[in-house]
A protein has these predicted regions:
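Structured catalytic-domain cores with a bias toward divalent-metal coordination
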Residues: 1-214
Length: 214
C-alpha cells in the first residue's frame, strides 16, 4: 500500500512539474523504500538480522547493516522542513487513514490537520519509540508526520486515494506545490488519553461486525 501511494505521488508530481506547479525554491524528495530486498521477500523486516528498520534510528555509520542504512537515510532527509513517512504497522489490521506524530515537545499537530484526514494522533513515546524515524526526524528539526495509509500487505484503492489527496493537500497548504485540491476533513487532534483497547472477555470465534471507518 505504501509503495503504491508513493508511485502515484511520483506520477502526480511529474505532471505538476510539467505545468510549473512546483513553487520556486521548493523541492520534494521521495524515498519509496529503504530496503528493496525485504519488500521482494514480502517482509517488513531486514531478513539477515530479522530487524525492523524503524527501530534502528538514529543509526550508526559504523554499526550493523540496518544502523548504517538508517544513519544514511536520516542524513539525507534531516534538513527538510517537512517530512511525511508512509508507515506500515507491526500488527495486522486496517486503519482509517490518519496522521500520527510523537510527542517530543517539538511536534506541531495543528500543521498535521492540514492533511485533512479525520484525526491527528499525538502519541506519548515509550522507550522503544525513541528509535523510530518520526521521533528522530523531529529531533533533527523537521516537522515529521507519520501517515497511516489504511493497510500494509495489500492495496486498498479507496484508502490510497484518500492518502494521496492528503499529501497533495498538505504540500499545497505549505506552499510547496500549486495544484487544485478538494477540501478535507476538519481533523480532530487526539492523544493517548482518547485511546481505548477493547479485548474479548472469553475465548471463541471472532465475527467482525464493525470495520474501520464504517
Amino acid at each position: 500500500q505504501q509503495l503504491y501511494v508513493c508511485a502515484r505521488l511520483v506520477s502526480f508530481l511529474r505532471e505538476v512539474e510539467k505545468e510549473d506547479g512546483i513553487q520556486p525554491g521548493k523541492s520534494v524528495m521521495i524515498v519509496p523504500t529503504a530496503i528493496g530486498a525485504s519488500m521482494n521477500e514480502g517482509s517488513r523486516l531486514w531478513e539477515p538480522e530479522n530487524m525492523d528498520i524503524n527501530r534502528r534510528f538514529p543509526g550508526d555509520p559504523a554499526g550493523s547493516t540496518t544502523e548504517r542504512i538508517t544513519d544514511a537515510l536520516l542524513e539525507r532527509v534531516k534538513n527538510y522542513r517537512y517530512g511525511v513517512q508512509l508507515t506500515s504497522f507491526y500488527q495486522p489490521g486496517s486503519f482509517v487513514p490518519h496522521v500520527r506524530m510523537m510527542d517530543t515537545g517539538r511536534q506541531n499537530p495543528d500543521l498535521g490537520c492540514e492533511f485533512g484526514l479525520p484525526y491527528v494522533y499525538v502519541r506519548t513515546p515509550r522507550d522503544y519509540d525513541q528509535t523510530t524515524l518520526n521521533y528522530n526526524w523531529q529531533l533533527c528539526g523537521t516537522q515529521a508526520y507519520s501517515l497511516y495509509a489504511g493497510k500494509t500487505r495489500e492495496i486498498d484503492e479507496a484508502a490510497a486515494d484518500q492518502s494521496l489527496r492528503a499529501i497533495v493537500r498538505f504540500l499545497n497548504s505549505r506552499g510547496v506545490i500549486r495544484s487544485e485540491t478538494a477540501p478535507g476533513h476538519a481533523s480532530a487532534i487526539i492523544t493517548n488519553a482518547d485511546m481505548t483497547s477493547v479485548s474479548a472477555t472469553s475465548a471463541g470465534l471472532l465475527r467482525r461486525v464493525k470495520f474501520a471507518g464504517a
